[in-house]
Amino acid sequence: MQDAWVEQMEQTLNPMSVPMDNPIGTIESKDRQAILAALLVHLWHGYRKMRDCLMELEDAMLQGNREQARSLLLQIKRFCGTSFRYEEDAVLPALDHHIGSEQLHELTAAHDLVIRHVRRLEGLLSTSPGGEEQIEQGRMLIHALLMQVACTAGLTLLIETLPQDALIRILQARERALVEGKDLYEWDKDIRG
């Protein structure tokens, strides 16, 4: 059973680069289980992609491959921009009754921390190689980002409990965020203000 799930996950299109097939026009006709399954597959792929990019970024930094590290950081910024957009627009408001406003505030503050960590990583990659200390600083930031991915992925346990209309709103918000394609800084400046 687990192998079938992994196989299905591997065969699904990468949600980082391909929006879903017009979910806004047809999703209402599907049952809750189908909607939930589609949402969880897309969320899971996104979190896996982010995890993989962060782990590859750490490897690139350890190998001194700054060009690859900068390329991976661009992917991370794009993922975070779209992901944080639909999380703050639809996921977090839908979970308010489960976790309360204080936890919602902490999750939103975690997005601010991610922005600071990504900026620090960019700073490390924009300067001349600084040796072991610079690499260790980068690794600490990457590890903190990996923990944030793991914590956010855990929200899927609560998303599973949401009613169909909330699931549809999350899928629609996700689709809009992917179509807009704002990176982390654009989202923070243009959308959050």
Positions of PLM-derived features:
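Small-residue-biased structural context
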Residues: 1-193
